[in-house]
A protein has these predicted regions:
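Metal-dependent nucleotidyltransferase catalytic core
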Residues: 1-27
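General structural signal for secondary-structure boundaries
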Residues: 2-6, 16, 34, 118, ...
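Conserved nucleotidyltransferase catalytic core and NTase-mimicking acidic/glycine-rich helix/loop elements
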Residues: 38-171
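Short conserved active-site loop signatures built around small residues
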Residues: 31
Length: 171
């Protein structure tokens, strides 16, 4: 998918599930492998598309929130169809990924957008750029500090259990 399609098709008829998924994964969990300046420029262009000059100080980055919600709905519907009876995809591992890992990604996006309240559009863009550059878990730690520890310890326990070959076999 060309980069301009990720930016210019948000919410339009041509904004397919594939484009939405790639755009949101880029925003919510992207790590650069090379050419950081180009990645950064595209990242900032994408954020500017979500937060225009018309966004008020009192609001949050609502357009981004709506797209994050749409992305989560998309993967939830995809999960349902891919795990119906007769499909080859395994139900339990997919469900666990959706319930925990994808919700972490989703919540991390919503929290980043919520943190933009009180800023003008320039400040909102800067706050999103700062927070969305962080991995979702680090993002939650940054926003919530020590209040996030208990939940993140439980999440760590879940991930360690999910990586246990014996448990995975039983799933």
């Amino acid at each position: 998918v060309p980069a301009e399609e990720l930016v210019n098709r948000i919410g339009l008829d041509g904004d397919t599930n594939s484009i939405t998924t790639r755009r949101l994964l880029f925003l919510l969990e992207c790590e650069w492998l090379y050419n950081e300046p180009a990645k950064r420029a595209f990242f900032d262009e994408l954020i500017a598309n979500y937060v225009t000059e018309n966004v008020t100080r009192d609001s949050i980055a609502r357009f981004l929130v709506n797209d994050v919600i749409r992305y989560y709905r998309t993967i939830s519907v995809d999960f349902e169809i891919k795990t119906r009876e007769g499909r080859a995809k395994a139900w339990a591992p997919r469900r666990l990924k959706l319930v925990f890992s994808r919700k972490m990604l989703y919540f991390g996006g919503i929290i980043a957008a919520a943190e933009t309240a009180g800023f003008d559009y320039v400040g909102k863009r800067a706050k999103l750029s700062e927070l969305l550059q962080l991995p979702p878990i680090t993002r939650l730690q940054t926003v919530f500090g020590d209040k996030s520890l208990a939940a993140l310890e439980l999440y760590d326990h879940f991930l360690s259990r999910l990586n246990d070959p014996e448990i995975r076999q039983r799933l």
